[in-house]
Amino acid sequence: MKNSYFLLFLSLLIMVGCSDKVLRIACVGDSITEGYGLAVQSKTSYPIMLDSILGPKYAVLNSGRSATTLQKKGDFPYWICKEFSNVFVYKPNIIIIKLGTNDTKPNNWHADKYEQDYQAMIDTFKTISSKPEIYVCLPVPVFKTKWGINDSTVVHGIIPIIEKLAKKNKLSVIDLHKGMSNEGVNFFDSIHPNEKAVKMMAAIIAEKISKK
């Protein structure tokens, strides 16, 4: 699996070098982005589906890492992962941030730190030489509390902060919480989407990007 992701990353870099007309998209996120639980992550994750929907004018990098938090002092910060570093190497034109689900765990959740670190991530990505356009995703619903992950914190904590920062930084919001609210049957463990739900997520994101 690791080799397949490395080859995909390498092929995307080669594609970038071959054509300046291809818009590069980096999908930043946790296990929902990486494709946890899907039969073949490297072929059915939402970034792969997004790449298929958008077509040859776009090249999409899956930069998701399972179990990660946006908060720097969470139990597994995205900041320390190679996937975070890969975003800078890739020099994307567009970055899609979908982080927050694991931050809702009681041992992780600190509203002030989440807001502070989310702003820091936005500011850090803005330093990339390609000057990427940043989209922020409202997390998909948590249909049943599990591992401490809960929808109450998503609704009352995560979403208001993301909306506040989007307004402050003039960023586009992709509402996956509302968009996937009726799809509980397609979240196999109440948190992670199956192949059908992944395709729906990709379609929602593609529609938002295509309108620009």
Where are these regions (language model features)?
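Conserved beta-strand segments of alpha/beta enzyme cores
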Residues: 59-61, 133, 170-172
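A short helix->loop->beta-strand "cap" motif at the edges of active sites that frequently abuts
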Residues: 126-133
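Conserved SGNH/GDSL esterase-like catalytic core that processes O-acyl groups on lipids
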Residues: 22-27, 32-116, 153
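Bacterial Sec-dependent signal peptides at the C-terminal "C-region" and cleavage site
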Residues: 1-3, 10-23
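Catalytic His-Asp segment of secreted/periplasmic serine-dependent ester chemistry enzymes
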Residues: 38, 140-212
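Generic structural signal for well-ordered alpha-helices
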Residues: 84, 118-123, 159
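Alpha/beta-hydrolase-fold catalytic nucleophile elbow
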Residues: 98, 137-138
